[in-house]
Swiss-Prot record:
NCBIfam families with a match to the protein in the record: glycerol_kin (TIGR01311), PRK00047.1 (NF000756)
GO molecular function per UniProt: ATP binding; glycerol kinase activity
Gene for this chain: glpK
Organism expressing this protein natively: Shewanella oneidensis (strain ATCC 700550 / JCM 31522 / CIP 106686 / LMG 19005 / NCIMB 14063 / MR-1)
Protein residues bound to sn-glycerol 3-phosphate: T13, R83, E84, Y135, D244
InterPro entries: ATPase_NBD (IPR043129), Carb_kinase_FGGY (IPR000577), Carb_kinase_FGGY_CS (IPR018483), FGGY_C (IPR018485), FGGY_N (IPR018484), Glycerol_kin (IPR005999)
Physiological role: Key enzyme in the regulation of glycerol uptake and metabolism. Catalyzes the phosphorylation of glycerol to yield sn-glycerol 3-phosphate.
Binding site for glycerol: R83, E84, Y135, D244, Q245
PROSITE patterns assigned to the protein according to its UniProt record, in alphabetical order: FGGY_KINASES_1, FGGY_KINASES_2
Activity regulation, per record: Inhibited by fructose 1,6-bisphosphate (FBP).
Protein name per Swiss-Prot or TrEMBL: Glycerol kinase
Domain of life: Bacteria
Species lineage: Bacteria, Pseudomonadati, Pseudomonadota, Gammaproteobacteria, Alteromonadales
Amino acid sequence: MQKKYVVALDQGTTSSRAIVFDHDANIVSVSQREFTQLYPNPGWVEHDPMEIWASQSSVLIESLARAGIHSDAVAAIGITNQRETTIIWEKATGKPVYNAIVWQCRRSAEICEQLKAQGLEDYVRQNTGLLLDPYFSGTKIKWILDNVPDARAKAKRGELLFGTVDTWLLWKLTEGKVHVTDPTNAARTLLFNIHSLSWDSKLLEALDIPAAMLPEVKPSCSVYGTTRIAGEGSEIPLAGIAGDQQAALFGQLCVEQGMAKNTYGTGCFLLMNTGSKAVRSSHGLLTTVAVGAQGEVNYALEGSVFMGGATIQWLRDELGLIRDASDTEYFASKVADTNGVYLVPAFVGLGAPYWDPNARGALFGLTRGANRNHIIRAALESIAYQSKDLLDAMIKDSGVSLKRLKVDGGAVANDFLMQFQADITDVEVLRPSVCETTALGAAFLAGLAVGFWNSVTELEHKACIDTHFKPSINADYRQQLYAGWQDAVARTRS
């Protein structure tokens, strides 16, 4: 049977999805299933690994059935996943010893403080590109080994395996034959040396983690094993893996130095490809691993805006200024500007490049003439200003000028926001036809690995741009607007 399709498994924080793409990178079928979020204690977040697997395997079957596609027509399956989330299971039985500890979980903060007290903070920054923070996998592994009965003894006997979600899915799909991850996921564990591209023995020793638990690291674009869907049909190659943000970067074909993408979700995730050079940030950005045009390791700078779409949710749910997020474009366009109003949405502090956890949200510039439309417009503009803050930091750190910004995520449907993003950053903003860029990245990696597509050059004809947003304001006005934002941020922090 002719191989006509590639399937991307997109395992996210709240749901598991399977998306079927054809040879022209069109979406043929989508299936999605949410799963349970567990909050056993304040600040703790867990998932049931078996529920992750059940939801992911069921949507894989469902996505093909929904489109009437036989599994024999599938050329390959790619995986993209929520990063950092930590699973440990028994090698012999495949049974998890504890729930998955999710990236958002803060329970291992004390372990991070212990590592800082040991003077490891700079070593971690230099060799992993990360900050010593509970966000990453390493301290979560140590917590499980320290707190689950017999876990440490079993680990030392070589009876336990660790994996991020990609590794867990690969293990289950191959019925325990393959224990592998890729560099983009390994780079989020706090245990991976991004320069030598190997597990770091000093950090394993500091966290008392046996190396035998860790998966083998293989390229993001390669064949890891095979699977049969629901035990039927021929063996399908499992052939591409990348963490969600790096998958989106590849899906946008940001495969060369200076290419960047911004994913507009609840927050915003910005990544800039820095090529073969790992750039250490002086602005609090993370240095991480990305995927190059040939599937090779590239490096990237990564930063996140805490309040992106969440700011619009606040307008809707707490202030009642809008009924639906899409209303913001209409109301923002009803006024020529914000009438001097700035919203700094520091509801949970400010992230990079400010790193001020004590900053709090504020509205500035309110006069008697300020109305609802001005506040709504200021909220949208705040997303673009925060993204500019990060992009400027990336440009300063890397010394690379940014020519264009690729965008994806739910908020890119907002033409006003996209145009203002182009105006305030003075770069062209490109919105793709297929906004499912995370899944598309996994599909591209899988398809390239098995020869379904031949090269990134071929993919450039598949990943079509829907809209080009070009800067439309002059430099003086741009500087005036941004100076107002910087002043508002400074006041928020004082």
